[in-house]
Structure formats: structure tokens, C-alpha cells
UniProtKB/Swiss-Prot annotation:
UniProt-listed SUPFAM superfamilies: CinA-like, Molybdenum cofactor biosynthesis proteins
Family recorded in the similarity comment: Belongs to the CinA family.
Classification of source organism: Bacteria, Bacillati, Cyanobacteriota, Cyanophyceae, Synechococcales
InterPro entries: CinA (IPR050101), CinA-like_C (IPR036653), CinA_C (IPR008136), CinA_KH (IPR041424), Competence-induced_CinA (IPR008135), MoaB/Mog-like_dom_sf (IPR036425), MoaB/Mog_dom (IPR001453)
Protein name per Swiss-Prot or TrEMBL: CinA-like protein
Amino acid sequence: MAKTGVEILCVGTELLLGDILNGNARWLAQRLADLGLPHFRQTVVGDNTERLMGAVREAAGRCRILITTGGLGPTPDDLTTAALAAAFDTPLEERPELWEEIQAKLSAGGRAVAASNRSQAFLPIGADVLPNSLGSAPGMIWSPCPDFTILTFPGVPSEMRSMWVETAEPWLRQNAGAPSAFVSRRLHFTGIGESDLAEQVGDLLDSANPTVAPYAALGDVTLRLTASGSSPGQAEAVLHPMEEQLLQRTGRFCYGRDDDTLAAVVLRLLGEAGQTLAVAESCTGGALGAALTAVPGSSAVFSGGVIAYSNAVKQQLLGVPAALLDEHGAVSEPVVKAMAEGLRSRFHCDWGIAISGVAGPGGGTIEKPVGMVCLALAGREGCDLWVQRFGARRGRSAVQQLSVIRALDRLRLRLLAQS
């Protein structure tokens, strides 16, 4: 069987059991795609030497490059380096200079140097060190047999990413056959489902260069465009017309590119308009405010928020009349309108968003079922009111996340319309 591409092997029982989401594999897969390196398989193995050895031997027969994460620490369940060496009958050797470096890092960080840390200074004979500038667990670049190279990384995401950028990515560009010129771009869409988006751009999904691939997440669809060429300029020239075609067909549904988030885009538009925003949340419990404040510099346009979970707080902090609550209930368009307008009045902001709904799993009625959310966007020219019915089967967290997305997207569209 001809060997092709790159595989990812993630080590850790916590990953295998689902206790921790495997964010490292996702991040690495995106970076490999950005490099134009074919990546065909991901494997997760628990902290077990025999199974780890078997997985590595199998990979050696399929791929040219294996990237591993996890299992490089000093504890008994950190088995990766020793298991890899055993899989290819290669002795481990201590690297004195590596041991000195590990001790220096631990001491500089005010941490005691344990005898177990010394195990991190042992690598298979013939392996090169993959430096870790942020932690004590070095990785390695090792070719234990012809046409097969292993790159090992710790499982700590910040350390793994730093090592990738500083050392691994340059090595891959030089040694792994990455295209000399490769451009990748991600276009992000909301307010449209994957199937509806595919209907609009379906004929473009068959393109060979650039390729166009859709990926769906909760409330969001991404199109990844990848183009190659003999030079960076030529690769960009191949990609640009496709990007323009996609944007012409999809228009307002595309909210950003690459690392853009919907919250960041909204905040940027607010900044460009010189306007401010405040939020009043009931069923989302602060999720909208959290999404906004996760963006650095948000304080320039985000005035603040109120988590008005109870009717009393809606009355006291937002000025919602008790009679309105009695007549319509907290989950109603009149109440969210009063919340949003009261918010604008008290925060002296340009825009006010209010959300109130039945996130579930209980609390629904025939008139107001689980998954029903009322939203309001108040501005200088009036108040938009709308109801979203997300359904009970999605679950509480999904209802909350989708409510945040719909609120932000409505504000995005209003800001674009006024510019």
C-alpha cells in the first residue's frame, strides 16, 4: 500500500472517554489544511503502552508523517515517548543538555524539580528535540524507519501551538512537500443552513483549484477555500475570483472571514459607526455579554448588561411595568420591547438588545413551548421585535447559544443597513 499524507494520533484516556474535548486535533487539522498537506486520519488512544505501540506501527504502514499529542509529562501515565521507542525497538538515551534545560525552566517558574521530571530528558536514539518554550515537556522529530517521521507534542494546547508555530510548521514546509504557494480562506455564514447554502453555491463545490468545502456548526456554516499556485500571488489570484463569486451569491449571510467571530464583527461595526450597545438577558443568563466581552477592546463600544432573570429584576433595573408582565408574561414581545427600551434609557446607549425565552427542558406551555425565545433590538429609529422557535429537542445550551447568534446577527444587519 502506498503511503500518503499526515495522520494525527492523540494520546489520553481523558480524550478517549470524552472527559475532555479534543481541541488539539481540530486545531492541528486546520493548520495542516492551511499548509496544503493531505490529512486522512485521526486516532485517539488511551494511556496504554501496548495499544499506543500498535497504533503507531499501523500508522507507519499508512502515512509518511505522524503527529502525536499528549503523554509527554513526568507522571506514570505519560507513556508516549517510551512507547514510541519500544514500538521500533529503539533504546532511550538521556540528553544531559535537555535535563539541564528542564531543571532551569522549573526553577525559573518557582516549581520544585522532582525526580520524575528527569524522564522528560530521555528520547529515542536518533531523535531530534522539538523545543517547548512554554513548558517542561519537550517533543521530538524522529524518523524510526524509512519514509516515516513522528512529531510529538505535549497535550497542553498553548504549549502544543507554540511548538507548532515556532518549529514544527517551518520543518513541515521544508521537509513534508507542502506546496510552495498555498492560500486558504474561511468564509463564515449565519442565518442560513448548510443545505440552503449548498443550493446557492452547489456548482462551485466541485471546483478543483480552489477547492470549496462546507462545514456546519450550531447556527454557523463555514466554507473553506483552498488554492495552490507557483507563487503566493498566483495562489491568491486563483482564490480571489471564487471568493467573489461566493459572496455575490450569498450576500448578507456571510459575516466574516478566517478568525472572525460574529461578536467581533458586530463590535467592529459598532466602532466604525461610533455607537454603543447594552444587553438585557433572561434565558441566556449572560451568554450574550460573555460573547461580547470575550473580544479584546469590547469596552470601547459595549456599555454593559443586565441579567434580568426574575420579574422583580426586570421591573427594578429595566423599568418593565408590572402590569405588562402580568398581562403578557416574561416571555413575550411587549416585555422584551420594554426591556430593550428601558436598557437604552438607563445605559444611554445607541442600541439595546433584550432576550427572554423558555430554554428548557421544563417550563414550556402550549402557547409558549420550550425553545421559544422573544428578542428585541431597540435603536434610535425604533425597536425590532421577533420570535424564534428553536424547538425542545435541541436542548437548553443550544437554545441559549442560538439566541445569542440570532440577536447579534440582527444587529449586524441593522448596522450594515445604516452604513
